[in-house]
Each structure stands twice: as structure tokens, then as C-alpha cells.
């Protein structure tokens, strides 16, 4: 499981021009990629990291700050570009496998007290964000 975490001063995701998820003020955007072998162990580890990582201003976590996390599924995090000019995504989990894992991550974050907004799994989304810092961190489990 792979998460690209970005510290933001604002973020939102739109589907068909409609806002479906938003973080107002400081927070994090978590772009999440899943492989077929990912499960409860990876979800628990990454939920803890996302919730407790002290990457907001003044060395605070989203829990410390009461900040939100916008979770966006992104299978392209597992692009394989080693051959040719067109990436393949064979390492990414198919939707029936990946969607419940992303849902479990969202639920695990909420159980930790994190305010979570989401995109729509599998939708063509427009993600608008203002990266703060910039701070971008790759988490893997």
C-alpha cells in the first residue's frame, strides 16, 4: 500500500463539477494506492502514521490540530514505467480488491478521531489543493 501525503492549506475534490469532499484550512491530502496483497495490517499502520505524523506547522499532527484529511484513491501510484512509453498498472489492485481497502483506511482514520473527507472511488475527479510548504511525503506499508 502506498500513500502520497501532502500538507495543504486547503483542498477539495470535484466530480462532474460538484464538490464531493473538502478540507478547509490546514490539513492533509492522502492519495492512496493499493496492491492485491494489501489488507488490515497495512491499513492499521498507515492510519496510525497519517493520524500521528507531525508534519503540520508547529510540529503538530492532524490529531493535535483537529485538522482534516482528504483521502483520494489513486491506482496510478503503482504505475510501471520501466518499458516503453505507456505505463502499466498491473501492480495495482483491481477495484473489487482496492475499494474495500481504501474504505477501511477511511474508517480506521475516523476511529482514531480524524476528520476525513473523500473522493469517489473510481470516478474521474478534479482535485484542487494548495500545497503548504511544500511538504510531500511517500508512505509505504
UniProtKB/Swiss-Prot annotation:
<dbReference type="GO" id="GO:0106026">
    <property type="term" value="F:Gly-tRNA(Ala) deacylase activity"/>
</dbReference>
<dbReference type="GO" id="GO:0000049">
    <property type="term" value="F:tRNA binding"/>
</dbReference>
<dbReference type="InterPro" id="IPR023509">
    <property type="entry name" value="DTD-like_sf"/>
</dbReference>
<dbReference type="InterPro" id="IPR003732">
    <property type="entry name" value="Daa-tRNA_deacyls_DTD"/>
</dbReference>
<dbReference type="Pfam" id="PF02580">
    <property type="entry name" value="Tyr_Deacylase"/>
</dbReference>
<keyword id="KW-0820">tRNA-binding</keyword>
<keyword id="KW-0694">RNA-binding</keyword>
<comment type="function">
    <text>An aminoacyl-tRNA editing enzyme that deacylates mischarged D-aminoacyl-tRNAs. Also deacylates mischarged glycyl-tRNA(Ala), protecting cells against glycine mischarging by AlaRS. Acts via tRNA-based rather than protein-based catalysis; rejects L-amino acids rather than detecting D-amino acids in the active site. By recycling D-aminoacyl-tRNA to D-amino acids and free tRNA molecules, this enzyme counteracts the toxicity associated with the formation of D-aminoacyl-tRNA entities in vivo and helps enforce protein L-homochirality.</text>
</comment>
<feature type="short sequence motif" description="Gly-cisPro motif, important for rejection of L-amino acids">
    <location>
        <begin position="133"/>
        <end position="134"/>
    </location>
</feature>
<dbReference type="GO" id="GO:0005737">
    <property type="term" value="C:cytoplasm"/>
</dbReference>
<dbReference type="GO" id="GO:0051500">
    <property type="term" value="F:D-tyrosyl-tRNA(Tyr) deacylase activity"/>
</dbReference>
<comment type="subunit">
    <text>Homodimer.</text>
</comment>
<keyword id="KW-0963">Cytoplasm</keyword>
<dbReference type="GO" id="GO:0043908">
    <property type="term" value="F:Ser(Gly)-tRNA(Ala) hydrolase activity"/>
</dbReference>
<keyword id="KW-0378">Hydrolase</keyword>
<protein>
    <recommendedName>
        <fullName>D-aminoacyl-tRNA deacylase</fullName>
        <ecNumber>3.1.1.96</ecNumber>
    </recommendedName>
</protein>
<comment type="similarity">
    <text>Belongs to the DTD family.</text>
</comment>
<dbReference type="GO" id="GO:0019478">
    <property type="term" value="P:D-amino acid catabolic process"/>
</dbReference>
Amino acid at each position: 500500500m502506498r500513500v502520497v501525503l501532502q500538507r495543504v492549506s486547503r483542498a477539495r475534490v470535484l466530480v462532474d463539477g460538484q464538490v464531493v469532499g473538502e478540507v478547509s484550512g490546514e490539513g492533509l491530502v492522502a492519495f492512496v494506492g493499493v496492491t492485491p496483497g494489501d489488507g488490515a495490517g497495512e491499513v492499521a499502520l498507515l492510519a496510525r502514521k497519517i493520524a500521528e505524523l507531525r508534519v503540520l506547522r508547529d510540529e503538530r499532527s492532524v490529531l493535535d490540530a483537529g485538522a482534516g484529511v482528504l483521502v483520494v484513491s489513486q491506482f496510478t501510484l503503482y504505475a510501471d514505467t520501466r518499458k516503453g512509453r505507456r505505463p502499466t498498472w498491473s501492480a495495482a489492485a483491481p477495484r473489487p480488491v482496492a475499494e474495500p481497502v481504501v474504505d477501511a483506511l477511511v474508517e480506521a482514520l475516523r476511529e482514531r478521531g480524524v476528520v476525513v473527507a473523500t473522493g469517489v472511488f473510481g470516478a474521474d475527479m478534479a482535485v484542487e489543493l494548495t500545497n503548504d510548504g511544500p511538504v510531500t511525503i511517500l508512505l509505504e506499508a
